[in-house]
């Protein structure tokens, strides 16, 4: 994509009301614009990153055996009355009436709807186990939306729901998602720590939050320093015993949110205990028959008797992840995108758009990068070199290639790695090979 044809409204200064780094940089980099309190339009650059994050989430859900569907944002209030949560949920749930005076709501979560769908369509134990998921926009009427996409009122979520015949099967589904989440966040360049967590309004007996450490995080967290060492995640999720042993081994190291602190385990950790702040990017729950029983869901068991399925739910904040990645990966100049989620792989800078030789060389290099399948943002604008460098550093693409008169005299281009600042002069062919890696 040529920057001269792109829609990239970058800002030199941060708006006064932007409080945290990710909010400031997303606005400055032309990724989002606020349209109402806690509601944002996703501009082209931000939308590209959002789609890449979403695709990684989707691939790891599929890999874990989950099946994708899509549920609507609007839900009937009657479903929530069945579960008993309609009156209990609170003012965060936006309630409306349609023209026929039927009570509706913007879904803040989907336990009721997925339970109704499964209840009305699953008949036998042969329909279990199943994990169903969707990626959909949600709305929660936060009393004080803040921090940009980190705590907005409208946000993109991945929600998965498991249905199992017994507790053992439900725990296996839970463990599948536990590992899938660790793999998901690692692919995005994040180190997420699974922490024992409060179940909140979702309910249930077992819950983990996945926390990315950041000074701006809203959660106070406590963990063993062993969590600072990257763990191998090459376990067979279909092997029930091996997977349970793997999860037990991981969670043997203490990690908990403030609500679930364990003084005895903290004392045992001794000097290895750390206290920090973190950002919640995922939350998983096992809640047994809380919703299936309340909504009358049964299937015929192997012995012909009705069985109430065991359930779990598994959420990832897809849009929130973008803010978390920026909080974890930035410097004074701007964003530093991990390769897997960067909007483009390389930023190509023509230092002299008014120089016919530079323009021809940059155009040729752009064509070669595109032919090699390398996503490229080509700054072909007639701007000062300093402004072009500042824009590229701000938007944080993993690589920068600079084409200028001095380099052309030597038959080289300058290649810069954004994360390290390392610069090397290479031939065009070698630069492309280095990026393609």
Curated annotation (Swiss-Prot):
Main location, first listed in the record: cytoplasm
GO biological process: prolyl-tRNA aminoacylation
Source organism, top-level taxon: Bacteria
GO molecular function, one term: proline-tRNA ligase activity
One Gene Ontology CC term in the entry: cytosol
InterPro entries, per database record: aa-tRNA-synt_IIb, aa-tRNA-synth_II, aa-tRNA-synth_II/BPL/LPL, Anticodon-bd, Anticodon-bd_dom_sf, Pro-tRNA-ligase_IIa, Pro-tRNA-synth_IIa_bac-type, Pro-tRNA_synthetase
Catalyzed reactions per annotation: tRNA(Pro) + L-proline + ATP = L-prolyl-tRNA(Pro) + AMP + diphosphate
Keywords associated with the record: Aminoacyl-tRNA synthetase, ATP-binding, Cytoplasm, Ligase, Nucleotide-binding, Protein biosynthesis
A Pfam family hit: HGTP_anticodon
Enzyme Commission numbers on file: 6.1.1.15
UniProt subcellular location: Cytoplasm
Function: Catalyzes the attachment of proline to tRNA(Pro) in a two-step reaction: proline is first activated by ATP to form Pro-AMP and then transferred to the acceptor end of tRNA(Pro).
Subunit structure: Homodimer.
Similarity comment: Belongs to the class-II aminoacyl-tRNA synthetase family. ProS type 2 subfamily.
Protein name, entry field: Proline--tRNA ligase
Naturally occurring in which organism (per UniProt): Rhizorhabdus wittichii (strain DSM 6014 / CCUG 31198 / JCM 15750 / NBRC 105917 / EY 4224 / RW1) (Sphingomonas wittichii)
The organism's taxonomic lineage, starting at the top: Bacteria, Pseudomonadati, Pseudomonadota, Alphaproteobacteria, Sphingomonadales
């Amino acid at each position: 994509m040529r920057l001269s044809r792109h829609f990239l409204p970058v800002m030199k200064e941060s708006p006064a009301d932007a409080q945290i780094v990710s909010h400031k940089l997303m606005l400055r980099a032309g990724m989002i614009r606020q349209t109402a309190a806690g509601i944002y339009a996703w501009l082209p650059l931000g939308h590209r990153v959002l789609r890449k994050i979403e695709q990684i989430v989707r691939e790891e859900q599929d890999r874990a055996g989950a099946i994708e569907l899509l549920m609507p944002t609007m839900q009937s209030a009657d479903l929530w009355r069945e579960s008993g949560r309609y009156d209990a949920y609170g003012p965060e749930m936006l309630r409306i009436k349609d023209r026929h005076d039927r009570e509706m709501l913007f879904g803040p979560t989907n336990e009721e709807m997925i339970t109704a769908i499964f209840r009305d369509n699953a008949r036998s134990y042969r329909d279990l186990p199943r994990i169903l998921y969707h990626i959909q926009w949600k709305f929660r009427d936060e009393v004080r939306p803040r921090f940009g996409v980190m705590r907005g009122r409208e946000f993109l979520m991945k929600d998965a729901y498991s249905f199992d015949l017994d507790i053992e099967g439900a725990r296996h589904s839970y463990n599948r998602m536990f590992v899938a989440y660790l793999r998901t966040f690692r692919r995005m360049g994040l180190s997420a720590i699974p922490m024992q967590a409060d179940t909140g309004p979702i309910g249930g007996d077992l819950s983990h939050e996945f926390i990315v450490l950041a000074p701006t995080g809203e959660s106070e967290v406590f963990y063993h320093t062993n969590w600072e060492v990257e763990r191998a995640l090459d376990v067979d999720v279909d092997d029930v015993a091996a997977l349970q042993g793997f999860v037990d081994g991981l969670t043997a190291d203490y990690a908990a949110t403030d609500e679930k602190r364990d003084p005895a385990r903290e004392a045992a950790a001794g000097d290895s205990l750390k206290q920090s702040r973190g950002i919640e990017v995922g939350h998983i729950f096992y809640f047994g028959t809380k919703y299936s029983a309340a909504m009358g869901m049964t299937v015929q068991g192997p012995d012909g008797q009705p069985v109430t399925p065991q359930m779990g739910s598994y959420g990832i904040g897809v849009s929130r992840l973008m803010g978390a990645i920026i909080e974890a990966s930035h410097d004074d100049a701007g964003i530093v995108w991990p390769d897997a989620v960067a909007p483009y792989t390389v930023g190509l800078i023509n230092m002299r758009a008014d120089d016919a030789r530079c323009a021809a060389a940059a155009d040729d290099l752009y064509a070669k990068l595109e032919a090699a399948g390398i996503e490229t943002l080509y700054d072909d604008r007639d701007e000062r070199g300093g402004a072009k460098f500042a824009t590229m550093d701000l938007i944080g693409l993993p690589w920068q290639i600079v084409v200028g008169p001095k380099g052309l005299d030597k038959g080289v281009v300058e290649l810069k790695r954004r994360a390290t600042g390392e610069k090397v002069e290479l031939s065009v062919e070698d630069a492309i090979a280095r990026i393609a890696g």
